[in-house]
Amino acid sequence: MDNARFEDQLAAGCRALGVTVAADLGPRLQRLMSELLKWNAKVNLTAITAPEEVLEKHFLDSLAVLPEVTGAATLLDLGAGAGFPGLPLKLALPALGVTLVDTVGKKVAFIKAAAASLGLQGVRGLHARAEGQPETEGIPRAEVLIARAFMDLPDWLALAPAYVEPGGRVVAMLGKPQTDAELAARAAERQLRVVSARAYRLPFSGAERQVAVFAKE
């Protein structure tokens, strides 16, 4: 995928998702892709390696939740894997402080290397396991907690509140959309409330997604 096609596909994807990004995001995402594919040739970071799929399934899927994250000062990405959604969100929102946590050391090493290569400030990669004890785990709380396909929603809502600052929110990036009633029932089980929920499709494959936001009652 050449630079012009990447830029065209990024612009088309963002339009389809209804998100607005800065003009310099394209080149920075291309650098991130280059780092990802270079590392992935040596260590297994992701099964998604075709540039078109990296753009859609990693980058655009991450950027789709910009409306749910914009305005926050800090973001905690649990189960970040190779840095998604945290790294694309950081590139789109430079002032956002981002901590990305994963249990796999090589993925955290990549996150740190990619952040250094891109000259990102306010990004921290953390090799840790989140089990609901942030103080002992060394995981900082954040205004927004996010995860993409990290665990089933009931387990996520059981774990997440421990990592959210007072007044903060929990964002769940889901594959199969759930009904409003299902989301409300899951939230109530953990003394949470549903702030918002919306379904969307990835712009090229049409894959279904949903993003739901929760807050403490």
Swiss-Prot record:
Q: Which reaction does it catalyse?
A: guanosine(527) in 16S rRNA + S-adenosyl-L-methionine = N(7)-methylguanosine(527) in 16S rRNA + S-adenosyl-L-homocysteine
* UniProtKB keywords: Cytoplasm, Methyltransferase, rRNA processing, S-adenosyl-L-methionine, Transferase
Instruction: List the GO cellular component terms.
Output: cytosol
Note the Pfam families from the entry.
Answer: GidB
Molecular function (Gene Ontology), one example: rRNA (guanine-N7-)-methyltransferase activity
Kindly list the positions annotated as binding S-adenosyl-L-methionine. Answer: G79, F84, A130, E131, R148
What InterPro entries is this protein classified in?
rRNA_ssu_MeTfrase_G, SAM-dependent_MTases_sf
EC numbers for this chain = 2.1.1.170
UniProt main location, coarse: cytoplasm
Q: Which SUPFAM superfamilies does the record match to this protein?
A: S-adenosyl-L-methionine-dependent methyltransferases (SSF53335)
Q: Which Gene3D superfamilies match?
A: Vaccinia Virus protein VP39
Which family does the similarity line name? Belongs to the methyltransferase superfamily. RNA methyltransferase RsmG family.
What does the protein in this record do? Answer: Specifically methylates the N7 position of guanine in position 527 of 16S rRNA.
UniProt protein name:
Ribosomal RNA small subunit methyltransferase G
